[in-house]
């Protein structure tokens, strides 16, 4: 049973790209903690919605998150192809406390150029949202409510002084678990 209210992280001001990178590193640590093996359960699905105007830094945040999670290659914007998939190596401890690497799928969606709400489904991405891994979705509002509920809504806005305001709202229990990890930092 899920509860009706979930946690938020109070608005945080990002004054530079370095601040965005620092936030991404903090988030990566919590994601890695969340995906650690517990009773051989790696079947977690983590879904983030990124909300904000053009040029606010949604792709920049995603790029820093991917790099903080260990991706070393180029991070392309998925604007024209709807989705860029990545395979991340996540270190984990098994039942004997041995360190092993697990491949974690990461799908970066940009729905800005969609012609209609269910285009992401017609493109064959429905199953991606139920498979273990991470889905990061820019412009989720273009899907007009057809996407699964995001664990986190990450809102970015441009302040008058050109800094960014970052606000995080959890919508699920797993989203709350991530926020509790941030509060423990």
Indicate where each model-derived feature is located.
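The conserved Walker
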Residues: 54
